[in-house]
């Protein structure tokens, strides 16, 4: 019945649960669904339904992920939860589930554990901008001082990875107790903690800028010459808006060029503007066909620059995923597929790392042989002879 009330007129935010194995991420996901469904704001999804996550393929990588949706008074949320630690790593690196913010679940009984740390680091590396903390299993800790200690520990850990630990909302509660209450048709103290958590998420995680409000960027897929009219480049607009008469830059592979948009077409029809998500042809003034190639991007002037060297967080496919069967070593030279093209690059491993095995998640430094339009958060595939052997995200630009 709750489904009828679902509306699309609230701002949309993507979030997910992260944290150490068995600290209660999936139970919390089920509890949020159960507590909100009593208010007609969610469809009830039970624990098993969320835990038996379907496997999906994203860029050839198998990832098990559960997606649920729910609403608060103010917003509509899409929430992802992964059953296994490896699924989180893959999810965050491939961007299969882009998160505008995350709920970090920490057991009050155990405090932060190795994967707690790893998920915070990954969030920092792949650009999850905001974290709200749910200190779970508070019903198992009688000592208020112990709860305070765990909270301090979490704040210090967040600060050590450049998140604002002192200002991060931390809500303590029990996902299991809240789930039991909701199942019994009651609204008790534990359910209130879930509502407190959602109020903190509403309040602390900002509504992301819509893609159309961001700076214009369009990866070039193809280039045509139209006699008497000039050069047309085609592609799907990644973000922003482009209008006839706009000054834009062509960035990547060669020196940056500046030109003016003299036409925007979609399905062979002339348009005044194209926006994020549109597949368009853009007519460029005074640009020769041989000056432009696939792999370059059209962008708002000064919004993105070409780079060759960067640090990245990568996941290397295992052999069951169609990846390599053998490890690779320092100076390995695969192709990096960024947006629409492959560029060869050399990989430098971190100090003390001898080799990388299929299935590993590592931080690497890359030097490309040609500059490509890059920024922190740009995602790429690592390929060898046309097959994908890894997936990564730029965590820091070097030059």
From Swiss-Prot:
Renumbered residue ranges of the record's region G4: 136-139
Region described as G2: 60-64
Compartment list: Cytoplasm
Residues engaged in binding Mg(2+): 26
Gene Ontology CC entries for this record: cytosol
Chain positions covered by the region annotation G3: 81-84
Keywords linked to the UniProt accession: Cytoplasm, Elongation factor, GTP-binding, Hydrolase, Magnesium, Metal-binding, Nucleotide-binding, Protein biosynthesis
Gene3D superfamilies reported for this sequence: P-loop containing nucleotide triphosphate hydrolases, Translation factors
Cleavable signal peptide: none
Annotated catalysed reactions: GTP + H2O = GDP + phosphate + H(+)
GO MF entries: GTP binding; GTPase activity; translation elongation factor activity
Binding-site residues for GTP, renumbered to this chain: 19-26, 81-85, 136-139
Protein family: Belongs to the TRAFAC class translation factor GTPase superfamily. Classic translation factor GTPase family. EF-Tu/EF-1A subfamily.
Primary role: GTP hydrolase that promotes the GTP-dependent binding of aminoacyl-tRNA to the A-site of ribosomes during protein biosynthesis.
Name of the molecule in the record: Elongation factor Tu
Organism: Campylobacter lari (strain RM2100 / D67 / ATCC BAA-1060)
This protein's encoding gene: tuf
